[in-house]
């Protein structure tokens, strides 16, 4: 929190989602959503022209920004939000740029370790979690599968229908996240 030494009514509060400004001593604050601030975790692009840039943000949603707009300047209205919560890895389907997978943490539906599939055509998000278990409050030793805050997510370069996700094991899906198979042993040294 910064308080202007010459005018204590002017304050700036910074957080990992952005910054909020008050001109009345904290009675009201400007939103973080009207300022160009963000902390990005990961970026990706799709293969269309014009292309879209995707980013996952700390304490905000993920965002998809087009590289061009019909009207010149790219506005917030041109953007879309392919994932919710505090997001980690993001992967755009290599053959269908309308399909985006986003690892989401925190306020995501499904809780910690959620994996979401977004369709630009319908603007709908569907949960495609690797393992349907809420991890909040469970000791790691009691969990069958464990995922980090931002777990890896990538399409196979040799097969665009194969998606991999990393937890204490590597998982593979060949049906758009409808089902997952563990394909590695426990990689965590039994933590």
Task: Show the residue positions of the predicted features.
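Beta-propeller blade termini and top-face loops
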Residues: 1-191
